[in-house]
């Protein structure tokens, strides 16, 4: 049985383990797109023909793949921008800096950290710093330097800031223009006083005139798209035994009961998925020799027959909800890459196998960097997608995805903001390496929110398409315990396959 543990890290992470049982509804918070671990606090393709899906509870069966991803290359992006640098430091115990969201910020990148902040947060429109009160009393300084890529139209009005801090000492904001090796100070603001009308947060609003940047031409960079084709994927769970379906904890069941090691059942699932425009399964994987590993081998062989793609969802967490240690992660990834990279059905991006990482933020980014460097040194390179919308992860990983988006407020705007920050991340790197933006869609989660006869699923698809994603992930094909499945079922028939096909045609037909 499968259990999940929910904790909040920057934006809440849905922690998965490799045993099986239903779980509580998670809480996600996505008001800010974080770039570093959060914690700073304040006091208070044109598709081919596809098989017809019926409107009954009987799932469609087709013997050949009928919906393949477009092979039309996506065009590169040519981007003009100005590079703005913010040096932000404090000798107080806490401070936050918010930028006006009306400013068209394309992306942001952490450059340096100074001192020893106990927590810090770096986002496209929000910075924050914390240090112990004892350090502040001793006058110690902590800070971050962050670069921003601004659209040229951002220069038409002053850039507005709101600076807050604790009662101790002060904070300093330096705004600079970066052109090649030339760094020029535009404005410096020091906030040292206690605001008597609001001494708890001591707010200071100020603005910076950027019109002087118009005297120089914006930088211009061409960014290639990270993938050559749009692909629609579904998270897939190969852990079911025949007797699982008798559990009273299930809210719904497949029309035909199955075991995850049944060849006929897997083939039927692939055919159903293809008829709905799905190009591949992201198969939950719990390590060498596990039941999910045994079934992965079978899934790959059957997928090859159907020209269907497969990759793994690397389960970073143990059954306890705690992350695996570095040595185990290294061992598992080494096995997965060396064992499966040669399989024709295993997805590859520019020749490198694709690995999707679950709960990546449960392991420090520095640890991931070390793991991936060791694997590359062994000749075991891959394309890795991190979990969550922590943009700083793109210094190590090749793209971002989220598993559960069911409770993210303002999903359309969140997708657009994260897509922009991900797609343009290379603007601020030494070389403009393209990063993969994945939008997630899902029909619901457990009892919340209400599926509303497919309306919720449609709404997440609409939000995803507006962000122009490289790929779309569906949560899920068959996670029955959490009631996120779109696989044909007793309650819904093939409704969700028909909705999936509708949006797949709309998206790939662009």
Please report, for each region that a protein language model flagged, where it lies by residue.
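Short, surface-exposed tryptophan/glycine-enriched loops
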Residues: 143-154, 202-215, 341-342, 348
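Intrinsically disordered, low-complexity Ser/Thr/Pro-rich tracts
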Residues: 1-83, 103-114, 169, 178-183, ...
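Extracellular or exported targeting regions of proteins
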Residues: 115-123, 129-132, 149-170
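Glycan-processing catalytic domains of CAZymes
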Residues: 214-510
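Beta-strand signatures of extracellular beta-sandwich domains
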Residues: 174-176
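Residue-level signal for glycine
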Residues: 182-183, 187, 479
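A short beta-strand element within beta-rich, extracytoplasmic domains
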Residues: 80-90, 108, 142-146, 155-171
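Glycan-recognition and processing domains
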Residues: 74-141, 188-219
